[in-house]
Amino acid sequence: HLLSRRQRQMCIRDRAYKKILDKLRELTGGNQTLDMFIANYVYEKEGAHHKKVMHYTNLPQNHIFTWNDVSRFRKGQYILMHSVIYRTKLLRECGLELPKHTFYVDNIYVYKPLPSVKTLYYMDVDFYRYFIGREDQSVNEKVMISRIDQQINVNKIMVDEFDLWKIPNRKLRHYMFNYLEIITVISTIMLIRSGTEENLLKKRELWKYIKDQDIRLFHHLRAGIMGNAMNLPGKGGRKISVAAYRLSQKVVGFN
């Protein structure tokens, strides 16, 4: 769907928008079917002069490629809704359905179709501007904590969606593990940050849910640096968890 002029001015760069549309028209007329188109997005934080551009230097540029051609994603580098355009028929064929009246479903939107994606194209242009830092924003920590049940629901849906060990392509499997890991880390740290006994119980229940669903996945997530840091025991351990998350935000740009 084409965006209105006002939406384009607020969220996306017109020059990049035109380049992408031209390239999509060109690729649509080609011999090879394209499943996913990727472009850069920009974090623009309210009140800050520095803008963080999410580039994908690990991806081949300006030609169609497959997962086999992808280099390793670094920590903090994810394909988000702001950077991806899926082929519409692929979304229908993979059975994508998003929970209604729920925040944070953009993670399901990006995650669910990935195993169906065989061909990709990356254009190194800064397309979408993602404005962050507003107090009423859904990714604001206080807002996320108030909606934590919706975040947990999305997290569980992603856990249930696939047996990741059966994803045949090793590079895709590794990326999907990393994506599920950061979603689980975010759920966990928000539950810790709330400071309530009720939410600490929800934290334990979330990890038990993962363990009950897939014991190998549970151990894989727990064995990672962030997984370990999120599950340190006691009040002191929780302080270390929050400090580790804050450090990760600064070092690798978690939002």
Please report, for each region that a protein language model flagged, where it lies by residue.
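Inter-domain helical "communication" segments and dimerization helices
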Residues: 26-33, 48-61, 70-73, 92, ...
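Donor-binding/catalytic cores of nucleotide-activated saccharide
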Residues: 13-121, 128, 132-144
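Catalytic core of nucleotide-sugar-dependent glycosyltransferases
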Residues: 125-134, 140-167, 186, 190-216
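Single conserved hydrophobic/aromatic residue that forms the stacking wall/gate
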Residues: 1-14
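Inter-helical turn/loop segments and adjacent helix faces that build the functional surface
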Residues: 98, 165-171
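Amphipathic alpha-helical protein-interaction segments enriched in hydrophobic
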Residues: 170-189
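Membrane-interface aromatic/basic loop that binds lipid-linked glycans or pyrophosphate carriers
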Residues: 193-255
